Every structure is written in C-alpha cells, then in structure tokens.
Amino acid sequence: MNSKYLFVFLILIVTFTDLCQGFLVGILPRMRGFITPFLKKVRGRRELGSQYDYLQDFRKRELDLDDLLSKFPDY
C-alpha cells in the first residue's frame, strides 16, 4: 500500500518539476530581454557619475599642484 502512494508521489514530483523547468526555461529569456535595457541605463548613469568624480579629483589635484609649485622659488 505504501509503495503505491510513494509511486504516485514520485510521479507527481517529476511532473511538477518538469512543468516548473519548462516555465523557467520559457520565462527567463523574456525576463533577461526585459531587464537588460534597464541595467544598461543604470550602468551608464554610474559610469557618468564616476567620470564626474574623477574630473573633480583631477581638478582638485591640479589646484593642489599649482599651489605647491607657487611656493617654490623661481630660478
């Protein structure tokens, strides 16, 4: 009696996992195609932000260098 229920349970598990796998295989490419443009926009914003920080640091170092060079005597 127990083996009959175990067999039915295993059949249901196999069927359920097959359906889930088919669902995931079908939906994941669509989700990737939907999410990819948003990730590119976020990455582009992040790159612009990092370029802006880099330029600010570069200007600050340039001003510090000018200040340092102005303290040296002229020869």
UniProtKB/Swiss-Prot annotation:
The modification Arginine amide is found at R43. One of its GO terms (cellular component) is extracellular region. Expressed by the venom gland. It is found in: Secreted. One of its GO terms (biological process) is regulation of defense response to virus. Residues 1-22 form the signal peptide. It comes from the Eukaryota. Its main location: secreted. Keywords: Amidation, Antimicrobial, Antiviral protein, Secreted, Signal. Residues 47-75 form a propeptide. Shows a low ability to inhibit hepatitis C virus (HCV) infection in Huh7.5.1 cells and no ability to inhibit hepatitis B virus in HepG2.2.15 cells. Belongs to the non-disulfide-bridged peptide (NDBP) superfamily. Short antimicrobial peptide (group 4) family. This is Peptide Ctri10033. It comes from Chaerilus tricostatus. The lineage of its organism: Eukaryota, Metazoa, Ecdysozoa, Arthropoda, Chelicerata.
